[in-house]
Every structure is written in structure tokens, then in C-alpha cells.
């Protein structure tokens, strides 16, 4: 249902003759032009015309009537919901709710009544009675120029119409947007949903395995190359260390050789000293020999002189022998000393050489041992370095593998987070769309209920018109006729906005001696209760007073009970009369055991319940 189908105005202009029945054009169309009318002069059936609450006269109609709610809620001269003599009903004349000579909702007699009179409607009557009396809301020759719905009410109706149309437009637009979003969500799920994500990658498994094997082989080869490079570097370091150690060993041997050279120099110097001593002793020996020879020669020369001295002395020693003995003794001593010196020298040289050789062997053995130990240390250090390098390479490879897998895991986590965020956004969007859809659905249901209520009200009004007819509405039990929105019982004319026995909504009841109504109607007579909304017997506007006389019932919204034992009034109406039933919406029950009134109407004097927009009248009459 769109607002374009609702865009027709409630108040359309048309001319021509009246229609029949539920008529020519129908009361409910797709364009909802319910209150239009094509009435003009004359007309046959009830609730006829193109559509709306209008129609010509029927049986009781006087001169004829145009459809109500037409151009100005009126037609030619009469027409409407009910009429008595010349015309009446809900329209008449040229404007307003009154007819040319009659009008109003109902009239009890005379030329007119109800809401309009004269040539222009308003709330005043022409020659007939208004709300139960002669004048009603207005007397004289005519009333005001406006109808029952003022300009504000018309604008309100138009505004409500436009708002309803805009609501329906908005509902349709939101439904279309919702459908578009659902289609988009479905497309997204089809493209990027779990079904789209879970693709068949089985043909690529062999290629992936081959690539993985190649990656593993390349990684192993790379690691082997790195290990070879590290081993080569360690071997180079090993040779460098060996070179340094050999160089240090050579320097140590050179230092030992230099030390031995110093020892050899010392020994050579001692040998030279001993040789010098030997030469000195040889020279001394030669000097002693020379001196001895000279002394011997001197002594020999002295003995060769011619001196004869004869001395009687003891025989002397042989000096030659003594000298020879001394010479031999000295020679033996020199030889002994020389031999001792030579032996000592040789012994010292031998000892020194033995010490030098032994120390050299010890040095060589120590150097060999040191070299072996250094080689062992170097081998251990090389092995340690190789193990450390292998450990560092493996740790680096492990760290690279961890970093690579951590990066891949982080990428997967980011993808998962992005997908979760997208899913969360989609869920939130779906939730918002569901909330908006629920809200729009509730608004749509509420609007459909309101439209259904309008339909029911319209159909109820049509059924009441069809069932009761303009004639039944026009004739009361003992007096005036009961019109739409009210009815008469024992006196003046009944109906809303008019006084009667127990008028429905927008009106109050009046007894057998019905007085004039208050604002929009009032109750009086035989201890009648106070009027309903917008007036009453003694009640004020918009509030029903309590029932008077013989236990009258309390008034309801915009209405009140009246009469003896009257029931409580419903919305816009109230019960009246003895043991009157409770009033319905915009109406009420009335008269001696009357049943409860229906919407916009009520029963009277043991009659059945009134229908929508009308009510039963007369004794033993039924809706």
C-alpha cells in the first residue's frame, strides 16, 4: 500500500445526480476517496453517490438531497444522513452542514433543523429546531457560513492524511531499503562468506608440497653453505693461531739460543783467561829458568878464577845436584800444576758441555711438550669454535624460522581479526536492520490497524445506513428522527450536536420534557442526567456530569448517563432512560431497557443495539 494510492483527497468536488445504494462508485477504493460525493439534486439510495458519507434521499426525503461531504459537505437542498420534511441530513444548501431548507443530522419537524438552515449551513437552523428546541445552536434565518468541520479541523484532517501518506511512503522506502540490504548481505555471504572462503585447493596440494620441499632443500643447502663458511673461517683462525704459536715458539727458541750464546761467550772468556794464566805461568817459568841460568853462569864464572883458598871445612853439598833436584822439583810442580789446571779445565768444559747438552735436551723436550700441549689446546679451541659456530648457526636458523612463522601467524591473526571485525560489523548491521525492520513492522502493523479501524468504521457506517435506512433514521418513536451520531427518544430531535431522548456521541439525552442541550448537546427532563462531552444539562464542556433523578448513571468521556437508572456512558456518548444500557463509542443506549448503543449510535425504547453512525428508533425496532 503506497501513499500514491492514498493521495486522493477526502474532500473532492463532483457534480451530477445522486447515486444509489452503496452505490455507483463504491465507498472504499484503492485511492481512498471515501468522503467524495457526486450528489447534486436528487438521488435514490442510501449512502449512494460515488463514495463517501453522502447520498440522495430515500423514501422520506422531501425535495431531494445532494451527497454530504461533497464540495462543502453538502449537496443541493437536502440529503445527508436523515431528513424529515423538506431536507436535512449532513449537508444542504450551498455550504456547511445544513440544507437549503432543512439540514443537520436530523430534524423533528418543520422545515429544518440540525446544524444548518437557510441557504448557508453552520450550526444554526433555518426554520426548524436545533438541539431539541426551536433554535438549537443557532436560530433565525441562517447560521454561519462554515460547516461542522472548521478550517482547523479540515487542515488537521489534511495534515493527518499527508502524514499517513508520508508514513506509508517511508514504510515502502524502508522496506525497499531493507530488501536491498538483505540482497547485498546475501550477495556478500555468497561471495565472501564461509562457503566462498572454503574453496577447493586440492589441485594445488602437490605443487605446494613440491614448493615446500624445494624451500626445505634450499634452506638446508643455505645452512650447509653457512656451516662451510663458518668452518672455513674457523680453519683460517686455526691456522692463524698455529702460526702465532709457532712464531712464539720460534721466538722462545731464539731467546734460548741467545742465552746459550751468552753462556758460550762466558765460557770462552773463562777459557781465554785460563790460557792467559797458562801463558803467564809459562813466561814466569821461562823467566825463572833464565834467572837460574844467569845465576848459574855467574856462579860458574866466579868459580873459574885463580883463587885458591884452602879452608879446612866440612865437605859441602853438591850444588849442581841440588839445583837439578830443585829444577826437577819445580818442573814436577809446574807439570803437576799444568796437569791439574788442564784436568780442571777439561772437567769444567766437560761439565759445562754436559750441562749445556742436558739443558738443551730438557729445553727441547719441554718445547716439544709445550708444542704438543699448544697443539692440543688449539685443536680443542678449534673444536670449541666449530661447535659454537654450529650452535650460533642453528640458533640463527631457529630464530629465522621462528620469525618467519611468527610473521605468518601474525598475518593469519590479522586476517582472522579482520574477518571477525567484518563479521561483527555485518552482525551489527543486521541487528540494526532487524531493529529498524521491527520498528517499521510495528509502525506498519499499527497503521494497518488504524486503516482497518477506518475500514471498520466506514463499513459499519455503510451497514447502518443500509440496515436502518434514511427513513428509519428519520422517524422516531414519539417524535423526532434519530440521525447519525445520535437519535431521538421522546421529544426533540436526537443526534449528535442535537438534543434528543438519549443522543449518542457529541450529544446528550433529553427526557419527555427535553430541554435545550448545552455545548454540543445536553440532557434534561424528568430528572435527566447531565449531558456528555462538550456540554450537558448542568455539566460543563468536555466532561460529563453525574446522572440526576432516579439514580442516573455517571457520564463517560464526552458524554454522560441520564434518566432513571441509566447506565454509564461510553466514549463520546452515554446511556439514558430507565434501565438504559451503556453507551458505545460516540453513542449510547436509551429508553426503557434499551440495549447498548453501537459506535456513533444507540438503541431506543426496548429496541436493539444501534449500529455505527446511526441507531434504531421506534418501539420494538431493531438495527
Curated annotation (Swiss-Prot):
Conditions for induction: Induced by intrinsic regulatory mechanisms and by extrinsic signals from a subset of dermal palmoplantar fibroblasts.
UniProt entry tagged with the keyword Coiled coil: yes
Region named Head: 1-152
Start-end of Low complexity biased regions: 1-13
Pfam families reported for this sequence: Filament
GO molecular function ontology, one term from the record: structural constituent of cytoskeleton
Location of the region described as Tail in the Swiss-Prot/TrEMBL record: 462-623
Keywords: Coiled coil, Disease variant, Intermediate filament, Keratin, Palmoplantar keratoderma, Phosphoprotein
Stretch list, region Coil 2: 323-461
Listed name of the protein: Keratin, type I cytoskeletal 9
Organism in which the protein naturally occurs: Homo sapiens (Human)
